């Protein structure tokens, strides 16, 4: 069955705390995802180049991305996708997809679906590259298979990924 992303997910954009406040950055408190972090990661993201402090979270109002949430870049490098291995935060070029529990979904299935989707359809050409906005992304449709089919798709694609990696 086909669904618009907004029907099955709560879409959450990240945020960048002020770079002018050095106490916000690289304290080791909380991992903060940027596009660069998604460039060379596998299915799960567990490490980030930068971290933010608790005061950065509180004072900037940035929202947490819970563990096992699919995240995807949607500005400049569209479609770089991963699943959070733990609670994290992200910048505004990363969208987190919180499952609304409308239909049975496995994060690994969504990961592969997003990874192989042609995101150029509906993207706008920006000065430095392509970009999607939240409204356009929310209207995009994806095919959701039954939970049994999702498990089979994940199994096959995991096997292929392992063969390619080795």
Region locations from a protein language model:
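Basic, amphipathic alpha-helical recognition segments used for DNA target recognition
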Residues: 3-10, 39-47, 83-88, 95-144
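Short secondary-structure boundary/capping segments
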Residues: 22-24, 62, 86-87, 129
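Alpha-helix N-capping/helix-start residues
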Residues: 54, 134, 147-148
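A short beta-sheet element
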Residues: 34-35, 51-115
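Non-catalytic DNA-recognition/assembly elements of restriction-modification systems
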Residues: 1-16, 32, 139-166
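Short Gly/aromatic-enriched secondary-structure transition segments
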Residues: 22-23, 48-51
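A short, acidic/glycine-rich surface segment
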Residues: 16-20, 80, 123-124
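Low-complexity, Lys/Gly-biased intrinsically disordered segments
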Residues: 2-41, 58-60
């Amino acid at each position: 069955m086909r669904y618009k992303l907004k029907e099955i997910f709560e879409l959450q954009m990240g945020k960048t705390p002020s770079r002018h406040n050095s106490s916000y950055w690289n304290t080791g408190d909380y991992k903060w995802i940027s596009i660069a972090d998604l460039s060379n990661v596998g299915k799960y993201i567990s490490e980030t180049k930068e971290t933010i402090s608790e005061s950065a979270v509180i004072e900037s109002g940035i929202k947490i991305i819970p563990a096992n949430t699919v995240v995807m870049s949607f500005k400049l490098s569209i479609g770089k996708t991963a699943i959070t291995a733990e609670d994290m935060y992200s910048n505004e070029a990363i969208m987190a997809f919180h499952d609304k529990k409308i239909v049975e979904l496995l994060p690994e299935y969504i990961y592969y679906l997003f990874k192989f989707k042609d995101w150029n359809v509906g993207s706008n050409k920006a000065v430095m590259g392509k970009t999607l906005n939240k409204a356009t992304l929310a209207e995009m449709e994806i095919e959701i298979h039954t939970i049994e089919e999702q498990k089979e798709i994940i199994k096959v694609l995991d096997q292929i990924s392992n063969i390619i990696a080795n």
